[in-house]
A protein has these predicted regions:
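Hydrophobic residues embedded in beta-strands of well-ordered beta-sheets
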Residues: 155-158
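Polar, S/T/G-rich
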Residues: 1-146, 153, 200, 205
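Surface-exposed, non-catalytic interaction/assembly patches
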Residues: 47, 126, 160-228
Length: 228
């Protein structure tokens, strides 16, 4: 007997999106969060990363059948090109290999920071968009998932990602006027030394959780200047 109607949550797979023909989606493991115990139970056997995309060989630019995944790059590509609920941008106006490179970086395995040797994909997306919003706002929200930015120029929509790369230009004193750099500073109040991040925990079916992160050296120098 319940005193009120129980609140239910579901872990579902969303829409199917086009993926490169050399892509494979990991669907080997399904988990559920048990509210009464706070534990996570594995329903099917196998060690996997739900929705992660991996690639075999070199991509020739051809897409395969639409498949569900949790890849932020190709979900974003779908949002841009879809003519029913997206931006209706023709595929010829997109640099698809930029999305491919972003996808590879997002799906690399990194430590899960749970105290063991476990790993998890660097970036995944599991969101529900069920309200109308300005397209530029939607694009900004989506690119923030993979630390990206986008711009439109010369008839081409381009997207790039903030990630480690080889230096493209080395600039020294000989490259600037009079051979000297001019530096500008920022106020101390804007130099955040710690951050409190709110996020929806996938293992808890979307329950909001918080994570506190700080720069130890910066805290010792400026004190705690927190950003939420």
């Amino acid at each position: 007997q319940f005193s009120s109607v129980p609140r239910r949550k579901y872990l579902i797979r969303g829409i199917k999106v086009q993926l490169p023909n050399n892509a494979k989606v990991d669907i080997s493991t399904t988990q559920r969060y048990v509210v009464s115990t706070g534990a996570t139970e594995t329903i099917t056997s196998g060690v996997g990363h739900i929705g992660r995309v991996t690639y075999t060989g070199i991509w020739d630019g051809t897409f395969g059948a639409a498949t569900w995944c949790a890849d932020p790059a190709w979900c974003f590509y779908n949002l841009l090109t879809n003519t029913r609920y997206g931006c209706s941008i023709p595929a010829v106006n997109l640099q698809k290999f930029e999305f491919y490179a972003i996808s590879q970086y997002c799906n690399e395995l990194v430590p899960d920071l749970k105290g063991g040797t476990g790993e998890e994909p660097r970036m995944l997306v599991n969101v529900l968009i069920n309200q109308r919003k300005q397209i530029f706002e939607a694009i900004k929200d989506f690119t923030s998932i993979f630390r990206g930015q986008s711009f439109y120029g010369a008839g081409i929509f381009s997207v790039f990602q903030d990630k480690p790369e080889t230096s493209r230009y080395l600039i020294g004193n000989a490259n600037v006027a009079d051979g000297f750099f001019e530096y500008t500073g920022t106020s101390q109040a804007s130099r955040h030394t710690s951050c409190t991040v709110a996020y929806q925990d996938y293992q808890k079916l979307g329950e909001v959780d918080f994570e506190y992160v700080e720069d130890v050296d910066a805290v010792s120098k400026y004190g705690i200047i927190n950003k939420q």
